[in-house]
Amino acid sequence: MIKDITIGQFFPGNSVIHRLDPRIKFTLTFAAIVFVFVANSAVAITLMTLAVFSVIALTRIPVKLYFKGLKPILVIILITSLLNIFYIRTGNILWNWKFITITDQGLMRSALIAVRIAVMILISCILTYTTSPTDLTDAIERLMKPLKIIRVPVHEIAMMMTIALRFVPTLLEETDKITSAQKARGADLESGSLMQRVRAMIPILIPLFVSAFRRAYELAMAMECRCYHGGEGRTRMKQLHLSSRDFATLAFGAILFCGVILCNQIPPSL
């Protein structure tokens, strides 16, 4: 399951989504995640889902990679959906047995939550799959630039956020390797009581922490060897400029979000 986590990876390409200004992509990604939770009708959430899959098609990245990124959260989606099914008692009763009651509102709410979580992950994957670490850092730094007035270290914050995001797949891959190595040595990680399983994780966590600190040290040394000293005086080989394509994308996003608000008024509400 660990190797199925793909969020944080970058897949180079030349699609229209890859060529968008990273500031536009970051802004629309944040807004889209917000509007996924704003959508509270079947029509609104369907509109958001169709828009997300349309963008996925435009990225020219295999769809299976996006669905691969959903595998690790299937358990979370399932548990959340079941909780909503069994704990929501409003609406028409569809099935009742002792203390278990399933209603139509519970089913609709659980479906809405499941779709929301899945679409949110897909939106995040679109951003990381189509935006290089350098572009993502520049986008975050530019968007946070007004905070420099109150002496917030914008560049350093943007750099830390990007490094943390990009280290996710690296650490997950390292975890998978360590787990496989421990299993090859006879470690049993899947049986026993809860405390036994927790203790069995210690031989995995200690090497993982050592590896993480080693990679952090190597990265720090590499940045120091390249004379990196923060954002002050830093120049950029690639300057960000908004094009007509970016403004058109921004307008499309605004129309989509307005459509979601309007669709919320269409019954039935979830």
Question: Residue locations for each model-derived region?
Answer:
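Membrane-helix interfacial "entry" motifs
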Residues: 14, 37, 60-65, 97, ...
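Juxtamembrane/interface alpha-helical elements of multi-pass membrane proteins
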Residues: 73-187
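Transmembrane helix-loop junctions in multipass membrane proteins, especially transporters and channels
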Residues: 41, 45, 60-64, 88-96, ...
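Transmembrane alpha-helix interface motif
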Residues: 1-42, 48-57, 142-145, 149-152, ...
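Alpha-helical transmembrane segments and their helix-start/interface "positive-inside/aromatic belt" motifs
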Residues: 25, 64-74, 246-249
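Alpha-helical transmembrane segments and their membrane-interface exit regions
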Residues: 51-61, 75-79
